Amino acid sequence: MNRSQPINLINGKMYCQWPIFISECYESQYFIITYYVNLVTATIFTLLAGGILIMRLIAHRELNLLSNGIIAPLEGFLGFSMLGGIARIVCSVTLIIDVLPTYYIYREMISDAQWVTAQLSVITYLAGVFRTLPHMPFFQPSCSNHQSSTTNMTICVPTSYLIRILYWTISITLIIITSGSAMLAGYFRMKDNRFLLNVFTSIRLVAYGISCAILVIGYSIYGRLFINLTMQSFDLVQGQGEIIEEFQETHIIRDEREERRNLRFKYHIRKMKMFNNSALMTFTFWSLTSFILAFWHDQIWSTLFLSKIQAFIANISTNLIILTVLIVILLSEFVHHKGLDDETRNQLI
């Protein structure tokens, strides 16, 4: 079995189907360079995600990674991002060196691993948002019968039990459908069965499209609500703190403490907004792209301009977005720990 078998030809020509192979095809040099950049950027954000995760685990030894049956949101995001980065590294090395060129089950599985881990990372974070919302000040669920007509924040949030059920159901279903169809697509590519190859490729892409659409809805409604309530909660706590501190501290110490608190909050909100906006932008694009690819993947891959753009966004742009989010998280962690250290020193003085 060789690479130029009929199953890999589109309209009788050998185009690079870049999620599976980038060698011995049209414009292969472009895709090889793209995957070299993917390898470098994925290595950087994998190390960064792993470093931040270790730092948080050391700083928060009391943290329960499986609280209320759901993986801790930020730690889950970092962990799945690290796993996704490892999958991107393995995939890049495989395609650049052309390892196991006709073992398509392996190639489909490692290509799929990049995307399923990315989705699991943001699903985990969104589950944490759902779990936190009911405990925040100003939150008034629309399901309540005792709310006034002037309530601004009226929205229904599932119970903790339902959140846990939905989280594991969506995650496990996504893994089974995408990984199963990836394996079957690879198998039928090896068996030279184009019809079933297209069927299972479409099933996997439709599953990703639906999952991305759910995430876009979740982050556009509940993610933004979470940010707004966090800002209102900070204003409430800040106001109460100033009343107490008026009788306990000098004006200078109060101003210093308020400045540190404002700085920590500024970076915390920046982290939340960056995460939410990145998720919305990325998964809106991939929701539309997944549905289009599900039914017209051969047409996209055989149109070099569209194929190159998609490969660039899927690899380089996506990695840069993840890297930006991780840098913002790292800055937020540094500011948070610095503020706590300063407060500890002031208490000792």
Regions found by a protein language model. Give the residues of each.
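Helix-to-loop junction signature of class
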Residues: N2, N11, G84-P101, I175-R194, ...
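Juxtamembrane membrane-interface segments at transmembrane-helix boundaries in membrane proteins
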Residues: Y15-N38, L65-G76, P101-A113, T151-I163, ...
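Extracellular-loop-to-transmembrane junctions of the mid-late helices
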Residues: T34-A42, R164-L229, I313-N319
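The cytoplasmic-loop to transmembrane-helix boundary for the fourth helix
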Residues: P137-L184
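Intracellular effector-coupling site of seven-transmembrane GPCRs
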Residues: I155-V157, Y161-R164, I172, S233-F291
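Class A (rhodopsin-like) GPCR signature focused on the TM5-ICL3 interface and adjacent 7TM helical core
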Residues: Y208-I243, T282, V325-L330
